[in-house]
Amino acid sequence: MNKKPIIAFLYDFDKTLCTTDMQDYTFIPSLGYTPGEFWSIANSFGFENRMDGLLAYMYTMIEECRKKGIRLSRDYLVSCGHAIELFPGVEDWFARINAFGESLGVEIEHYVLSSGLREIIEGSGVSHEFKEIYACEFFYNEEGLASWPKLDVNFTNKTQFVYRINKGILDVAKDKELNASMPDDSKRIPFTNMIYIGDGLSDVPCIDRKSTRLNSSHGEQSRMPSSA
């Protein structure tokens, strides 16, 4: 029996599925900052040290929690996802599009490619809908506290995860397998079967057809907010 074709939906998260940056709902207020104050600290630190912006915000999270006596554990960050506010229609979108795909004889899969935090996304009400969540993530020491960036997902770095989905090499530790040559007919999901939904600058490399060959409409409209 022939296998069903697979259609993959790839989503940014902040300001695409939820209404603002995911740290803004609970994490930043717990430090006693407004979002503007926290991001100003993180961005200034990054500029002053010529640091990747995402690594700068992750470092700032660790340092500010240390100063305020907050245990930056995995469980704490997951709990910060409980307050995420999704855009109207997002929660039931997955069931609706899955049913539509089934009616057409295709299998639908959902993936996140986000510059936010995997742990916070896992605490949201829709995390169970995704086959894989690719987002920034911390490594935790023997005391259970965030001590080092485990994964950083930004800009052109996001495109590697499109290729992982294309080849079916989802484990981020399997770089050798990802970079090995693979015939097109062996790739699990063709680029032409992917739909990317994003809102910001960090999404541009993924939707640039020269980079990933994902489908795009000639009539599409792009909007570029101030942050990704």
Roles of regions detected by a PLM:
Residues 214-228:
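Positively charged, low-complexity/disordered segments
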Residues 18-20, 205, 221:
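Conserved protein kinase catalytic core
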Residues 2-142:
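Alpha-helical substrate-recognition element adjacent to the catalytic core
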Residues 81, 85-111, 115-213, 217:
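C-terminal cap/substrate-recognition subdomain and adjoining C-terminal extension
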